[in-house]
Amino acid sequence: MCGIVGYAGRNAAAPVIIESLKKLEYRGYDSAGITVLSKGIETYKAVGKIVNLEVEIPKNLGGTVGIGHTRWATHGRPSTKNAHPHNSGGNPGKISLVHNGIIENYMALKEQLTGEGYVFNSETDTEVIAHLVHKHIYGKPDGKEAKCELLVGLREALKEIEGSYALAILSADEPGKLVLARKDSPLVIGLGKGENFAASDVTAFLNHTRDVVFVNDFETAVLSPTSVEIFDREGKPREKKIEKIEWDFEAAEKAGYEHFMLKEIHEQVTAIHNTLAGKVSELEGDIYLKELNLSEDEIRKLARVQILACGTSWHAGLLGKYLFEQLAGIHCDIDICSEYRYRNPVMNEGTLAIAITQSGETADTLAAVREIMSYNCPTLAITNVVGSTITREANSVLYTRAGPEIGVAATKTFTTQLTLLYLLAVKFALVRDRLSPDYVKSFITDLRKVPGQIQQILNQKEAIKECAEGFARSKSYFFLGRHLNYPIALEGALKLKEISYVHAEGFAAGELKHGPIALLDEGTPVVAIATRGQTYEKMLSNIKEVKARDAFVIAVADNKDTEITKYVDVVLRVPQSDELLAPLLSIVVLQLLAYYTALARNCSIDKPRNLAKSVTVE
């Protein structure tokens, strides 16, 4: 959840690091800091936005090697003393480092190091690493003579550490070097000319270089302005593949929109089109998923699909569960990743695990995938980030071709995740002779219409804005849906919570009478997703239930539905579509409703409080 950057080059390090940290702001943070090797270690920190850090840094700060960090508090409250970098070896110190991850045995290590004379100035787990590295190099807190190089001392320290980490470390005695290490937390190296970079995310340095190397678990690296050396866990040099990032940095700019989120809602038209490209054939009535390392015979033999996901991705997975069971006739379970490892899952032969993660770095999802792989279960990852950790660990990978998503609240990655789940379920159904090629041809025709239908919704966003502004000060919202619309109700409520800080709950509409209806007050806004389908009549009954309690009902319904207007206060329209695909349209309305509510409430839409884009700690 934190952002790490490192620089070794020919230019002044501080401006490069500050620029890179700003590119990582979308990950969420509460404080920031940098260290530059100038006349020894020089460290500057600040609470709050990066602009607060900038005013602390001297304009004439020299040094061409440095590290930086945006912190999201996990151990210790947001404060200057808890902000990274953390140093060891006196003031200003011999060692300085930044860390993303969690050290699980830090209390035992802290007690040990305190007994050896090390003084702790923060409440963080990270400071333990700084002192431990210092101890292995200098022997004691006031040690002046190095017994070994920084890389060797780091390797020895890592043998004592339990937990996850991405580390960037500097030593005052090795002024031209930046040393890195990784386990269970993302870290990537950017290769420049006369300069090299390190970061949690390629976005940090993409305007400097497109050539990158991804650091794997248990690898260490040494960067200088002119060289990059990478080593395995035994310390042997490794040759690594250089990958080129193809997408443009301009794709991550706002392009005239007020917020990234609004831009990304609009980009769903292109994102879904790109995700479908090369994967469907109307003429043949077939779906092509060449990245899927499963034969047709293996697909026929599947007895179970296990979906693993968190947050918005879990909502996509819940809809996927309905699709796999309804279309392909395959039993499907879905688990929240943070719970999965602790319930001793019963595994069966013929199970396919599908892990859904926007970033490919979600710590809980990676842990769940590793757990299920211990049962020799084949794994398929659905992610948006090429080269992310999950792409290197799963057996198969399907990419949502959504492009970079900067807004913390997921929009286009959600609809492209759904798109891939539709393709998977229909492909499995076709292979298992549950759907005919003629049906698949018709389905593909309808699916290809979705981007244009989303554009129609975007063209009427003023009506959604007007509705949102009318209820922006409401204290609580209900979102109701049945069957395929239930996951969309959950996602709509989550969007509103995330960016407008309004209490909102999504419910299966049939569950209202089992308790939630007691919460309804006069005028409570209830968003009812009531597109036509097999549960439409029951949904109308639920709407009548809440209207009888004087709730204000906002319906999401198709543009040919005249019946709905008799029972609700406002109708937000979507184009008429196949019942199966209606969720792809309804969610766009709810994304816009959340956006305009947050805008009316003057909230921080792209970087909501207390949230991070990439959740890389468990």
Curated annotation (Swiss-Prot):
UniProt entry keywords in alphabetical sequence: Aminotransferase, Cytoplasm, Glutamine amidotransferase, Repeat, Transferase
InterPro entries tied to this protein: GATase_2_dom, GFAT, GFAT_N, GlmS/AgaS_SIS, GlmS/FrlB_SIS, Ntn_hydrolases_N, SIS_dom, SIS_dom_sf
Record-annotated Glutamine amidotransferase type-2 domain positions: 2-226
PROSITE patterns, per database record: GATASE_TYPE_2, SIS
Membrane-spanning ranges: none
Catalytic activity as recorded in UniProt: D-fructose 6-phosphate + L-glutamine = D-glucosamine 6-phosphate + L-glutamate
One GO BP annotation of this record: fructose 6-phosphate metabolic process
Keyword Nucleotidyltransferase: no
Annotated coiled-coil segments of the chain: none
Molecular function GO terms recorded: carbohydrate derivative binding; glutamine-fructose-6-phosphate transaminase (isomerizing) activity
Example of a GO cellular component annotation carried by this entry: cytoplasm
Subcellular location field: Cytoplasm
Catalytic residues identified in the record: 2, 613
Subunit and partners: Homodimer.
Role description: Catalyzes the first step in hexosamine metabolism, converting fructose-6P into glucosamine-6P using glutamine as a nitrogen source.
Name of the protein described by the UniProt record: Glutamine--fructose-6-phosphate aminotransferase [isomerizing]
Organism: Methanosarcina acetivorans (strain ATCC 35395 / DSM 2834 / JCM 12185 / C2A)
Lineage of the organism: Archaea, Methanobacteriati, Methanobacteriota, Stenosarchaea group, Methanomicrobia
